[in-house]
Amino acid sequence: MNEKQPVIELQNVKRYFQVGSETVKALRGVSFKIYEGEFVTIQGSSGSGKSTLLNQLGCLDTPTSGEYYLDGISVRTMSKTQRAHLRNRKIGFVFQNYNLLPKTTSVENVELPLMYNSEYSAQQRREAAIQALNEVGLGERLYHKSNQMSGGQMQRVAIARALVNNPAVVLADEATGNLDTRTSFEMLVLFQKLHQEGHTIIFVTHNPEIAEYASRNINLRDGKIREDVINHNILSAAEALAALPKPQDD
């Protein structure tokens, strides 16, 4: 059996910001590797450095010092344009607020990342988008617009959009933050399914409960890793969903 390769590797990453005369040390030497097929939560309270780390992982920013490798590629010395290209090919983002274009269909939203990929024709884009929407259980809503869907359905569109480019890693930022309890567990069922299919997932959250459904948890405090543990007792989101009280009809 071949050893899995690190998709993400941080080596002593520091990120400092100058605010007036003060230096804010948002990340104070963060090192870890995330391997192919892992489902990792990154947790931390406000001020822990979680958002700064998310920007590093998403190639939205570069370290003050240290190294960041995404799928074996060094990010630190890249220009903004190079990082944008790498980000589009290697990372699938899922945001708390869905970030869907209004007045466009599910398929059109999911096609967006492929617009910048010259390897795809218009027909191939459409086929890939339909496949991704089927994968997240929205095969019946391909041509629905955002205002015709629930929050959970819109988040499924966002997850399909994240998957369409076959990224090295899916990076979810508080992806259940705007959803009710039942819909949140439906999303966790989907993330666990994607994990079982071999997708690498990083789920940034302030909710410690989500760590119980992931394979590993990294906890930040004051810009440093406080804890990095493997979860040997992964709970089933499907079982948790089934145990919830049935929704009452109005």
Regions found by a protein language model. Give the residues of each.
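Conserved beta-strand-loop-alpha-helix hinge in the C-terminal portion
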Residues: 224-249
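ABC family nucleotide-binding domain
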Residues: 6-220
